[in-house]
């Protein structure tokens, strides 16, 4: 650790040269006192010795103080950088953030349960129909996509309930699958008996007012996250919960039916798989671009196709459980893949040279 910086060394040099200059003036003062009275030589010598000792002590204390001051400054600067790096490391990876379903508010507005899910807890603005939202499956809280992406880039908890949204190493986003015979949703990760879900958790306030979070009509996707039962208050400066524990958090909770939840997760996987489509390759001319339109037009058409697929998939009719199966989701993925391939112009391998007769 470098202690002697340029400014600090200049300060120490000035502190050393000033007492030395005073030492040079001390003999002249003692000589003037000795010329006035020759009988006081002994007392003048004692006073000069005392003055030298005092100046030496003062110089020593000054040097020690300067050294300690420089060390404290270096430690504070180093500690500040360590705290900053530790806060940066607490964020969630971009891949995990993108695994949370994103959609437009107008696409799920007609399917939500209750009057909740109408406001973002980060910017405190109501949702508009054409605004992109991001839904948190562990706690069903919904935020603007830009707001929650910025929040999770430096934090790993939900802004409302402080649920841990970071996945452990080796875990993946829980993708529910449908059983053809029973029609029940099966999660990819088994829930342990000691895990507690957000459903039915209660909060007790200091003023003897009990607030119980509304019981969700759906089980949700709560397999890989641990949601605390009690919402402990934290200050806004620490970057944790922005909502007081006794406030009504229904307006931040978007409760959706199980079928809609499964469709959102499936369509989010489809959208992520079609972000970067492979290009057809020729052995003679290498990679080729899309055959229909330019790159920007292809991405625009693919996004429109995906949006139509989302709207179509969410416009389902609630039927008994045995009727629904995984065939609907597989057909949807196949149709969306074919539509995107057609819009992007990335067809299967074809001959680039005409056949010779």
Curated annotation (Swiss-Prot):
SMART domains: FANCL_C, RING. Residues 340-357 have a biased composition (Basic and acidic residues). The modification Phosphoserine is found at residue 273. It holds the Pfam family zf-RING_2. Its EC number is 2.3.2.27. One of its GO terms (cellular component) is membrane. InterPro entries: RING-H2_zinc_finger, Znf_RING, Znf_RING/FYVE/PHD. Pathway: Protein modification; protein ubiquitination. It is found in: Membrane. The keyword Phosphoprotein applies. It is a single-pass membrane protein. It catalyses: S-ubiquitinyl-[E2 ubiquitin-conjugating enzyme]-L-cysteine + [acceptor protein]-L-lysine = [E2 ubiquitin-conjugating enzyme]-L-cysteine + N(6)-ubiquitinyl-[acceptor protein]-L-lysine. It is an enzyme of class 2 (transferase). Residues 172-210, 281-304, 327-357 are annotated as: Disordered. Keywords: Membrane, Metal-binding, Phosphoprotein, Signal, Transferase, Transmembrane, Transmembrane helix, Ubl conjugation pathway, Zinc, Zinc-finger. One of its GO terms (molecular function) is transferase activity. Gene3D superfamilies: Zinc/RING finger domain, C3HC4 (zinc finger) (3.30.40.10). The RING-type zinc finger domain mediates binding to an E2 ubiquitin-conjugating enzyme. This is Putative RING-H2 finger protein ATL37. It comes from Arabidopsis thaliana.
């Amino acid at each position: 650790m470098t202690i002697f910086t340029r400014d600090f060394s200049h300060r120490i040099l000035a502190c050393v040269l000033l007492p030395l200059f005073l030492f040079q003036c001390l003999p002249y003062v003692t000589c003037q006192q000795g010329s006035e009275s020759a009988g006081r030589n002994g007392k003048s010598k004692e006073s000069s010795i005392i003055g030298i000792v005092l100046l030496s002590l003062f110089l020593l204390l000054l040097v020690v103080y300067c050294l300690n001051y420089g060390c404290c400054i270096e430690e504070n600067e180093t500690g500040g950088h360590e705290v900053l790096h530790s806060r940066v490391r607490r964020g969630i990876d971009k891949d995990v953030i993108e695994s949370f379903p994103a959609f437009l508010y107008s696409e799920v507005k007609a399917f939500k349960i209750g009057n909740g899910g109408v406001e973002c807890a980060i910017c405190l603005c109501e949702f508009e129909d054409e605004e992109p939202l991001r839904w948190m499956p562990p706690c069903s809280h919904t935020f603007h996509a830009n707001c929650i992406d910025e929040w999770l880039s430096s934090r790993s908890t939900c802004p409302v309930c402080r649920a841990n949204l970071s996945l452990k190493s080796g875990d993946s986003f829980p993708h529910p699958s449908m059983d053809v015979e029973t029609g029940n949703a099966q999660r990819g990760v088994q829930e342990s008996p000691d895990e507690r879900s957000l459903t039915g958790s209660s909060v007790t306030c200091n003023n003897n007012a009990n607030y119980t979070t509304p019981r969700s009509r759906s089980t949700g996707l709560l397999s890989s996250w641990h949601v605390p039962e009690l919402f402990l208050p934290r200050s806004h400066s620490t970057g944790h919960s922005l909502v007081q524990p006794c406030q009504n958090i229904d307006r931040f909770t978007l409760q959706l039916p199980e079928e809609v939840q499964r469709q959102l997760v499936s369509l989010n996987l489809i959208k992520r798989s079609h972000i970067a489509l492979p290009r057809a390759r020729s052995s003679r001319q290498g990679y080729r671009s899309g055959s229909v339109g330019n790159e920007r037009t292809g991405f625009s058409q693919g996004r429109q196709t995906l949006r139509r697929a989302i709207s179509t998939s969410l416009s389902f009719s609630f039927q008994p459980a045995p009727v629904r199966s995984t065939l609907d989701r597989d057909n949807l993925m196949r149709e969306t893949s074919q539509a995107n391939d057609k819009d992007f112009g990335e067809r299967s391998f074809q001959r680039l040279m005409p056949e010779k007769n």
